[in-house]
Amino acid sequence: NCASFGGIPAAAPAPTAGLGVDQLVTDKPVINLPGCPGIPEVYTNTIVHYLVFGQLPELDELKRPKSFYGVTIHDRCLRRPFYEAGKFADSFDDEGYRLGYCLYKLGCKGPTTYNACASIRWMNGLSFPIQSGHPCLGCSEPGFWDGGGFYQGQSAPLDRPGLTAIGAAAGAGVVVGAGMAVANRAQKRGGGEKVE
């Protein structure tokens, strides 16, 4: 993260005005590979991509390879089903934590952090913070040191897409069903055929 976005030297109120390499080197292409610590496979695969194809990989707006930083930790998190079900750990010593519930209320930044931790993992694929019971700190995002307390709980869960889709489908079903009921009543009064 230090080479990509300035890291601790750039954190407030540091007097150093630390910068990322891409803010200093403006006449050459720069690829940011943030993470604290970084994932070795991300480094090696990015280098191999350049050696094999002779070009930089596709990058996001922060100059990170989309193949590794294209989805959030949350998108691939093994605790995501608990998030969708609304099951959260409220403290590091409660029943929800022991059962492996989502760590969002314990400050997990996985929903807003783009990195490959949940798919590649660290230490030769052994684990990553959330799998080991620790909330994501958001270390691959700019300014993560200034992004609030690491264990500061999130006040309300983000929109849960699965539940939103279910709610929208249920609402549409109610509207269609009501429309059919009204049409059937009108048909019965007029002696027409039943609407299906």
Which sequence ranges carry the predicted segments?
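Iron-sulfur (Fe-S) cluster-binding modules
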Residues: 26-32, 46-196
